[in-house]
Curated annotation (Swiss-Prot):
Gene that produces this protein: PapD
UniProt domain BPTI/Kunitz inhibitor: residue ranges: 6-62
Role noted for this protein: Serine protease inhibitor. This peptide can inhibit, in-vivo, acrosin and, to a lower level, plasma kallikrein. It probably plays a role in Drosophila reproduction.
Organism: Drosophila funebris
PANTHER family: KUNITZ-TYPE PROTEASE INHIBITOR-RELATED
CDD domains: Kunitz_SCI-I-like
Protein name: Male accessory gland serine protease inhibitor
Annotated site residue numbers, Reactive bond for trypsin: 22-23
Length: 63
């Protein structure tokens, strides 16, 4: 991977126990299986470093 965060699991909303949070932050994450950046809505808690503010930022870091 170009950067370590790109190898982390595709970022999802919520905590590991499946509770989603109430924030609404349009975000991008690198999906290693699809080998592309994908959009998702981050709820504001949980997740990991595989979360970016734009498609361009995700692609610059991971592709």
């Amino acid at each position: 991977f170009k950067n370590p965060e790109c190898g982390e699991p595709h970022s999802l909303d919520g905590s590991p126990n499946g509770i989603s949070c109430r924030g609404y932050f349009p975000s991008w994450s690198y999906n290693p299986d699809a080998q592309q950046c994908v959009s998702f809505v981050y709820g504001g808690c949980g997740g990991n470093n595989n979360r970016f503010g734009s498609q361009n930022e995700c692609e610059e870091r991971c592709i």
